[in-house]
């Protein structure tokens, strides 16, 4: 089992296929322990509705002030992820946005090995991945106030599924 990997997540401004990526996040694990973090807002002109803003915890103003271009954000993201196996929580969802973005901006698609937790959970538990289910089913505990906890839980779930 590999204990060195990167848990990745993208955030979009909606769930439909026309939605845009508004952030990239990644948490690197080495020897099964989180060691490095990456986060970048994207300022591509995508608009967040009030309801999406409430769910995500950031606003259009946040994207405009702190976001970088899609190209810069993605290059930083793939640089951070280079050399590591990637763990996703919902690969089917994330991949369609990443692939479309790569086509639109003429950027390279990630070539890392990818493992999808949603698929792993469906095979083992007959239901998809969720942070709460992973915590309860696998007995994972984290600091409730840590904004990175959802990536930490995903990494620990990946490790736990390979041990059991």
What are these regions (language model features)?
Residues 69, 130-131, 150-153:
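Generic hydrophobic secondary-structure packing signal
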Residues 1-107, 111, 132-142:
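Conserved non-catalytic scaffold segment of RNase H-like nuclease domains
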Residues 101-102, 124, 161:
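Generic structural signal for hydrophobic core residues of well-folded globular domains
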Residues 114-136:
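Short alpha-helix plus adjacent loop in nuclease-associated cores
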Residues 9-11, 94, 116, 150, ...:
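Acidic active-site catalytic centers that drive phospho-/nucleotidyl reactions
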Residues 137, 142-164:
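Acidic two-metal-ion nuclease catalytic site recognized across multiple nuclease folds
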């Amino acid at each position: 089992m590999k204990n060195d990997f990167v848990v990745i997540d993208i955030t979009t401004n909606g769930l439909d296929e026309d939605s845009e990526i508004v952030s990239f996040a990644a948490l690197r694990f080495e020897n099964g322990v989180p060691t490095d973090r990456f986060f970048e807002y994207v300022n591509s002109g995508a608009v967040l509705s009030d309801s999406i803003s409430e769910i995500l915890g950031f606003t259009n103003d946040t994207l405009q002030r702190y976001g970088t271009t899609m190209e810069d954000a993605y290059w930083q993201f793939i640089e951070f992820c280079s050399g590591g196996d990637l763990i996703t929580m919902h690969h089917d969802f994330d991949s369609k946005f990443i692939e479309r973005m790569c086509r639109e901006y003429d950027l390279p698609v990630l070539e890392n090995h990818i493992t999808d937790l949603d698929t792993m959970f469906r095979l083992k538990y007959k239901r998809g991945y969720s942070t709460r289910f992973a915590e309860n089913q696998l007995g994972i505990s984290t600091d409730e106030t840590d904004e990175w906890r959802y990536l930490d839980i995903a990494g620990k779930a990946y490790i736990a599924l390979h041990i059991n």
